[in-house]
């Protein structure tokens, strides 16, 4: 199979469909045939009125927007999963690999507000809609006198709820607003030093099956019918990997690897009040990282520069080490690994 049809799995939200269609258009421009399959995840169902959240799952939990898509990928029903990179755990399941990280959109956070031009103009006691522990902690470090309200749903739903007066302001990722053309109410794009983005924010992750057969569980009969024989599936996956790899952006891949290495070394999952952002100028990589106590009262902030050529994981580990030396684990109430 030299040029197989690439089946893309995606969530059904407006933003997820935009992202999947964007990737599909790039693949088609390279001469590939593409199909989309919409997959409903437990994270999507948790936003339905009356849905009972399964025990052990949190609306902010790691993996709630990816499990069903990964299940379809492992079973051979799809060939490519398009995720927001920040939704993926730092430890990738061995059954899968990240084939490509396309060029990144704006990684910053956006401040949405109608009557005030920025965070510092809000009156004391104003309400801000965000459920992200990172955004809440970093906002409290800047404005300890504001309050937070819970607001869930996709971008359009949150913008509608905000416009109805359910909060004075709203914080969303710039990337999503830019992709959907919903920037009319963005009055401030926070600087990297004000609200350091979540590791990988603004980047897409193109996830495929691993080519290492020993990483796969023995397939069920129905899965063999879907994916063909093992040899045929391996040949097919190899061709698909090569097609998708053409969409990779080396600078975005490096930056996000360094950012995610910080989170991985600190431990504790993607819902920590931790931000990391890497960019490159000339021959130097710059990695910004920030950890904030949940109440916003204590901040550990690092900017580390290293020459181009330094492995991304080494850069991330070094910055994590510096954060830990500044008390990051205590701020986050994380037990050191050697004590576990």
Describe every region a protein language model picked out.
Residues 7-9, 37, 81, 99, ...:
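Short, well-ordered beta-strand segments
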Residues 2-49, 55-58, 141-214, 223-229, ...:
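Small-molecule-sensing regulatory modules
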Residues 49-80:
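Short, structured active-site "lid" loops
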Residues 75-87, 209-211, 240:
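Ordered, amphipathic secondary-structure segments that act as subunit-interaction surfaces
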């Amino acid at each position: 199979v030299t040029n197989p049809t690439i089946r893309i799995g995606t969530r059904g939200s407006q933003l997820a469909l935009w992202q999947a269609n964007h990737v599909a258009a790039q693949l088609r421009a390279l001469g590939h045939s593409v199909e989309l399959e919409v997959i409903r995840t437990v994270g999507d169902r948790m936003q339905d009125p009356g849905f009972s959240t399964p025990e052990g799952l949190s609306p902010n939990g790691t993996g709630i927007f990816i499990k069903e898509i990964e299940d379809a990928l492992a079973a051979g029903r799809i060939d490519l999963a398009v995720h927001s990179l920040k939704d993926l755990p730092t430890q990738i399941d061995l059954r899968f690999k990240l084939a490509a990280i396309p060029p990144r959109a704006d990684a910053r956070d956006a401040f949405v507000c109608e009557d005030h031009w920025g965070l510092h103009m809000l009156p004391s006691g104003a309400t801000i809609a965000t459920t992200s522990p990172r955004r809440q902690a970093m906002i409290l470090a800047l404005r300890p006198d504001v309050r937070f309200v819970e607001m869930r749903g996709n971008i359009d739903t949150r913008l509608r709820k905000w416009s109805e007066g359910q909060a004075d302001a709203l914080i969303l990722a710039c990337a999503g607003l830019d992709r959907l053309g919903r920037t009319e109410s963005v009055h401030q794009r926070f600087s990297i030093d004000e609200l350091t983005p979540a590791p990988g924010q603004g980047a897409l992750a193109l996830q495929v099956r691993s080519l290492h057969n020993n990483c796969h569980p023995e397939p069920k009969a129905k899965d063999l019918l879907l994916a063909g024989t093992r040899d045929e599936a391996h040949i097919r996956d190899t061709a698909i990997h090569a097609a998708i790899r053409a969409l990779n952006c080396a600078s975005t891949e490096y930056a996000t690897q360094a950012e995610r290495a910080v989170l991985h070394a600190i431990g504790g999952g993607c819902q920590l009040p931790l931000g990391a952002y890497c960019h490159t100028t000339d021959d130097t990589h710059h990695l910004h990282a920030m950890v904030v106590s949940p109440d916003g009262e204590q901040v550990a902030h690092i900017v580390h520069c290293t020459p181009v050529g330094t492995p991304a994981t080494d850069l991330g580990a070094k910055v994590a080490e510096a954060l830990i030396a500044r008390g990051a684990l205590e701020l986050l109430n994380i037990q050191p690994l050697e004590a576990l």
